[in-house]
Amino acid sequence: ALGAILSTQLGEPAFSTPVVLVTLSVLGSQILTGALNDWADQGRDALVQRTKPIPAGQVGPRGALALAVGGLALQVATSIPLGAVALLVGLAASASATTYNLWLSRSAASFLPYLVSFALLPIWIATGVGAPLERIAAAPLLVGPFAVAAHLANTVRDFDADAHIGSGNLAQRLGRRTAFGLAWGMAMAVGIGVGTAFVVGGSTHVVGLALGAIGLAAVAQGIMGAQRLWAGMLVAAVCWTASWALATG
């Protein structure tokens, strides 16, 4: 969504070649990250999440690794035409996610890859579609805290399973209630803070304000539980990304 909005604001089609390429490169990164996560967590999943692809027999460990390599190949192949900066920023985001999968997911520093990878995402997209970086200069400062909140919300969903295997991720160190409260509070603070800044600064857009409000309501209802918070944050991520692009265009 961000790439398409930035492209139209530059006077280009919403689905221009750069937008399609950057979308495919991000998709490749997601495939790499997801497949590598399944491979790295196969032992854990066999104990507590047997519906995951490897323990369920849907794919073997080698197949998961092959899929991860394929995702990386897709990311690189579609990033090269976008230029060196987009290629390197995208690889940095994927490298950060890889450190989570292979090393940091069970440590108190489990939030760091989320902070880095998601903060790099708007820069990756903007450089890919050729938008001026000043357009999204403040975005990483806002995306980062939201990403940490998303990490906490996600790990609270798996709190019992992680506790069963002795995971030491940040949510486990903080405790279920504290981690959930921080996740909800940080996400709400980001939404309220950004919305207030736009209104006070006069950078308002009717559709953007509506999307911002929808995202805030989606997060607010998440106070009812971890699953609802996670779903609400997914909705907010889409709404707030579009709202940001419209308000700063």
Locations of regions flagged by a protein language model:
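Membrane-embedded alpha-helical segments that form the functional core of polytopic membrane enzymes
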Residues: 2-40, 75-76, 80, 84-98, ...
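Functional transmembrane core segments of multi-pass inner-membrane proteins
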Residues: 5-17, 114-159, 163, 176-188
